[in-house]
Swiss-Prot record:
Catalyzes the condensation of pantoate with beta-alanine in an ATP-dependent reaction via a pantoyl-adenylate intermediate. It comes from Cereibacter sphaeroides (strain KD131 / KCTC 12085) (Rhodobacter sphaeroides). It is found in: Cytoplasm. The reaction proceeds by a bi uni uni bi ping pong mechanism. This is Pantothenate synthetase. Homodimer. It is an enzyme of class 6 (ligase). ATP binds at residues 31-38, 148-151, 177, 185-188. One of its GO terms (molecular function) is ATP binding. One of its GO terms (biological process) is pantothenate biosynthetic process. (R)-pantoate binds at residues 62, 154. Pfam families: Pantoate_ligase.
Length: 279
């Protein structure tokens, strides 16, 4: 089993030894409740770095709903066993007070790319993400950091953060891992009922159909309206957004030109699912 480090001092001592030996360090930031998507990130890190740290921290600052924070699954022992199978070198699993000690007063906010979509529906969420990620990069002194493309907007926020603050870490986006029926892997999926789980792939199917329609000449507004209607018809309670945006800055796209990204968030069984695909 990989050692589970609880304090910044322990983590820094370990990393200092690695750096002194000239070894490269990769970090995979997670909130635990690990699944094959997370493990694919850890394997990618394992393949390209001498040392791999996986962080497990349910970050209270990125939840704007206290009930959501309370319900988030915490499965540390199971997570550590999964990470042992990948061969990670250390797990950093601090308590909230280790990351945000008494008197903590700094907030990192990335303007622009963080504001639409998730940013509009979850105020403060990306400030919480940017703040904890900036701290984790400082704590781990990582050379490379690995993030899933499933959280595309988060990936764009982190890339902007690193560029703007000259943080010396390379960000690697890794392809979304999906179930055989297309559903993107997510720690939230385990909260779906059996019926909800069967209906859940309708989200990505509607997105794929919209992408195909737009490539075939259907107008963007029409294709998106049809996709939203299809998601609701499949039994989803709400669609927060289903939009076509530029891939990098997430600006609205009125028609297909250049690299686009179709991004969606919808609620099923009271569980909020997000997904995105390239167009």
């Amino acid at each position: 089993m990989p050692p589970v480090l609880r304090t910044v001092a322990e983590l820094r001592a370990r990393v200092s030894d690695w750096k002194a030996a000239g070894e490269t360090v990769g970090v995979v930031p997670t909130m635990g409740a690990l699944h094959e998507g997370h493990l694919s990130l850890a394997r990618r890190a394992r393949a390209s770095c001498d040392r791999v740290i996986v962080t497990i921290f349910v970050n209270p600052r990125q939840f704007n709903n206290p009930a959501d924070l309370e319900k988030y699954p915490r499965t540390e022992a199971q997570d550590a066993a999964l990470l042992a199978s990948v061969g990670v070198d250390a797990v950093f699993a601090p308590a909230p007070e280790e990351v945000y000690p008494r008197g903590f007063a700094t907030n990192v906010s990335v303007s622009g790319v963080s504001e639409p979509l998730e940013g509009a529906h979850r105020p403060g969420h990306f400030d919480g993400v940017a703040t904890v990620v900036a701290k984790l990069f400082g704590m781990t002194r990582a050379d490379r950091a690995f993030f899933g493309e499933k959280d595309w907007q988060q990936l764009m926020v982190v890339q902007r953060l690193v560029a703007d603050l000259n943080i010396p870490v390379t960000i690697e986006g890794c392809a979304t891992v999906r179930e055989a029926d297309g559903l993107a892997l997510s720690s939230r999926n385990r909260r779906l009922s059996a019926e909800g789980r069967a209906r859940a792939p309708a989200l990505v199917r509607a997105m794929q159909a919209a992408a195909e329609a737009m490539r075939g000449g259907r107008s963007v507004p029409e294709a998106l309206a049809e996709a939203r209607a299809a998601v609701l018809a499949a039994g989803f309670e709400t669609v927060d957004y289903l939009e076509l945006r530029t891939a990098d800055l997430l600006l609205p796209m009125e028609r297909l030109q250049g690299e686009g990204r179709l991004l969606a968030a919808a609620t099923l069984d009271g569980v909020r699912l997000i997904d995105n695909i390239p167009v």
